[in-house]
């Protein structure tokens, strides 16, 4: 046996000994080839799961999108209709956030949504409604249109910006909201009698919430001394009438006031001890700054077209109550 052969056998023996020692520390149940195989399988399945997620997600949303449509004019009305019918209908608003319902022109897509709707709920006195309702009847003859202001005593405003001198912001009074909801509920029960019990239960819930909102507002404004306020666009006639306030309007015939009108309103505001000026979010109201500087009144931004009509009414009451502080 030569040196090479001897070293060959020695090296083999040492290798076998090392291999034996390693095997004592390595669990038999974890063979390397099996681990690699499972990893490869996971690499195949994981992308497959990613591909399937949109399918299941799409199925879920397809089910939601298959709800029949109801169209409404403004966001506060969508709040009411969704509370009553949201379980069975998808509710869409014709006037987007930030747009004026007095002058807004619906887009072709919005008019398409209206034509595909089962029902349409209108305030009945908004500027764009007067222009668009007749067109809706022509393009969608099967569409059923309901006016939610039925049964509500409409109030006049100080200028002609609302057409028939009528303030359309009926939802700024919680009591009016109750009547609006009752009108919606009656229409839903007529067209979907199968769910009458649900609609009436939801109506009762909304009535309780409106009553609680009214109670909170009365409590907040009960000790307010200054009962007059300025507002750029006359949107709080129903709120003022309900809670014992008087609104003075800056806007003249739907436009910025003339210098003569400006001077008259400033004089009247000073005499009436006005301490607050409301400015709606969708209006620029360039003259409001002049009124504020001339009268010392604080400017408060409001959004009567907000989805949460209740929060907006309470925020208005808080602003009026803060005059006492």
Which residues does each PLM region occupy?
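Intrinsically disordered, low-complexity segments enriched in serine/proline and basic residues
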Residues: 6-8, 15, 33-36
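N-terminal leader/targeting signatures
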Residues: 11, 26, 34-35, 51-52, ...
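Short hydrophobic transmembrane-like helices used for membrane targeting/insertion
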Residues: 1, 17-18, 42-44, 53
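Bacterial N-terminal signal peptides that target proteins for export
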Residues: 36-47
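Short hydrophobic targeting helices and cationic amphipathic motifs
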Residues: 3-4, 26, 31, 39
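Low-complexity, intrinsically disordered or signal/transmembrane-proximal segments
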Residues: 3, 9, 20, 25-26
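Extracytoplasmic metal-acquisition and chelation regions
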Residues: 59-325
């Amino acid at each position: 046996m030569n040196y090479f052969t001897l070293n060959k056998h020695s090296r083999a023996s040492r290798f076998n000994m090392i291999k034996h020692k390693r095997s004592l520390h390595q669990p038999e149940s974890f063979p390397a080839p099996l681990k690699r195989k499972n990893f490869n399988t996971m690499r195949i399945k994981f992308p497959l799961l990613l591909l399937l997620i949109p399918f299941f997600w799409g199925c879920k949303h397809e089910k939601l999108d298959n709800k029949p449509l109801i169209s409404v004019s403004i966001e506060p009305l969508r709040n009411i209709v969704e509370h009553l019918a949201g379980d069975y209908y998808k509710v869409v608003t014709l006037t987007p956030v930030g747009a004026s319902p007095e002058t807004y022109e619906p887009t072709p897509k919005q008019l398409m949504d209206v034509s595909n709707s089962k029902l349409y709920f209108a305030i009945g006195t908004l500027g764009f409604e007067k222009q668009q309702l007749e067109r809706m009847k022509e393009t969608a003859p099967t569409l059923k249109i309901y006016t939610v202001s039925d049964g509500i005593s409409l109030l006049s405003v100080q200028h002609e910006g609302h057409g028939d001198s009528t303030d359309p912001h009926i939802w700024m009074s919680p009591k009016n909201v109750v009547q609006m909801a009752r009108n919606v509920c009656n229409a839903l029960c007529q067209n979907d009698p199968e769910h009458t019990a649900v609609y009436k239960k939801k109506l009762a819930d909304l009535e309780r919430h409106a009553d609680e909102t009214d109670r909170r507002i009365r409590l907040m404004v009960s000790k307010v001394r200054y009962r007059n306020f300025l507002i750029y666009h006359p949107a709080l006639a129903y709120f003022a009438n309900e809670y014992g306030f008087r609104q003075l309007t800056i806007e003249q015939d739907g436009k910025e006031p003339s210098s003569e009108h400006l001077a008259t309103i400033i004089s009247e505001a000073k005499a009436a001890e006005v301490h607050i000026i409301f400015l709606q979010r969708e209006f620029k109201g360039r003259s409001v700054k002049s009124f504020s500087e001339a009268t010392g009144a604080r400017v408060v931004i409001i959004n009567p077209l907000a989805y949460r009509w209740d929060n907006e009414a309470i925020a208005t009451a808080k602003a009026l109550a803060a005059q006492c502080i």
